[in-house]
Every structure is written in structure tokens, then in C-alpha cells.
């Protein structure tokens, strides 16, 4: 019997200076969540760390560009059945960071995927479930 895990994650919808989404093409490696899928930059929260501190740290580690905490806008929270790993549970906080200069990034995990907003739907089948959740919240916020 496989023991279920509870993950605590913070990730960001990152938008460049031209309004494009900066997404992570995840490595095709056994053992990582949503291997080969398109994800958001972010990751696991460390003990004693707030979700905002987590997203600042994780995004910096993964894209090599520091985004100050006051530049992150909270998008949506999720707490329930794991979106990306069957049988697990998760709490995830999603943020938005805007006006990020794509030419200053140095992606260290996976590869950078720059997507025009009107092309995102064509990648729907490649998006990790957590990305679909965050993008639906983002689209809903744009309509409000």
C-alpha cells in the first residue's frame, strides 16, 4: 500500500514585459511530478516559511532572477486532493508576477516556454493540472 503525502506548494503565473506567459517545460525525468508537462515556476514550502517567502525563493532558484515579494500578487488558494499526483493531498498558493524581463532569466530547472496568451489554449493537453487550475483563476480574474 502506498502512503499518501501532503504537499505544500507555492508557484507563480509569470508574465513578461510583453504580456506573454513564462512557463516551465518540465524535464522528462522519472520520479518528478508531471514529468514532461508544462508547469509553473515554484515548489515546496520549507518549514517555517510563508507561502510568499516560498514563491520568492523557488522562483529565484528556478529562473535566476530575483522578484521581490511586493511584486507578487496573490491569485488563488487550493487545499484538497493533489492536482498533480494521484492519491496525495496538497495546499497550494498561486501568485502572479508581472513585467518580468525574459532576457534576464537563467532557467535552471526544465526549460523556459514563452507563450502568447492567445496561444495558451493550443497547449491545454500539455499543461499540468495545477497550471490549468491557476490559469482558470487568472482568466476569471481578468473578467472581474
Stretches with model-predicted labels:
Residues 66-76:
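A short coil-to-beta-strand element that immediately follows conserved catalytic motifs
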Residues 6, 51, 127, 131:
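Hydrophobic (often cysteine-bearing) scaffold residues that line and stabilize catalytic clefts
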Residues 1-22, 41, 45:
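Conserved N-terminal beta-strand and adjoining loop/helix that marks the start
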Residues 7, 35-40, 69, 88-92:
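Short connector loops at helix/strand junctions that flank enzyme active sites
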Residues 11, 37, 111:
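Conserved beta-strand and immediately adjacent loop positions that scaffold enzyme active sites
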Residues 20-61:
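Conserved Nudix-box catalytic region and its N-terminal flanking loop in Nudix hydrolases
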Residues 96, 104-137:
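NUDIX/MutT-family hydrolases
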Residues 7, 16-18, 76-104, 134-137:
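Active-site-adjacent beta-strand/loop module that shapes the phosphate/pyrophosphate-binding cleft
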Amino acid at each position: 500500500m502506498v502512503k499518501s503525502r501532503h504537499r505544500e506548494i507555492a508557484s507563480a503565473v509569470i508574465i513578461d514585459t510583453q504580456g506573454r506567459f513564462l512557463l516551465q517545460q518540465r524535464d522528462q525525468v522519472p520520479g518528478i511530478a508531471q514529468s514532461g508537462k508544462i508547469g509553473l515556476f515554484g515548489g515546496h514550502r520549507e518549514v517555517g516559511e510563508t507561502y510568499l517567502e516560498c514563491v520568492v525563493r523557488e522562483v529565484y532558484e528556478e529562473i535566476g532572477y530575483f522578484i521581490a515579494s511586493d511584486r507578487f500578487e496573490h491569485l488563488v488558494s487550493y487545499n484538497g486532493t493533489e492536482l498533480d499526483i494521484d492519491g496525495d493531498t496538497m495546499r497550494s498558493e498561486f501568485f502572479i508576477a508581472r513585467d518580468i524581463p525574459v532576457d534576464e532569466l537563467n532557467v535552471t530547472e526544465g526549460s523556459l516556454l514563452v507563450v502568447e496568451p492567445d496561444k495558451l489554449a493550443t497547449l491545454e493537453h500539455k499543461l499540468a493540472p495545477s497550471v490549468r487550475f491557476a490559469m482558470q483563476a487568472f482568466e476569471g480574474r481578468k473578467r472581474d
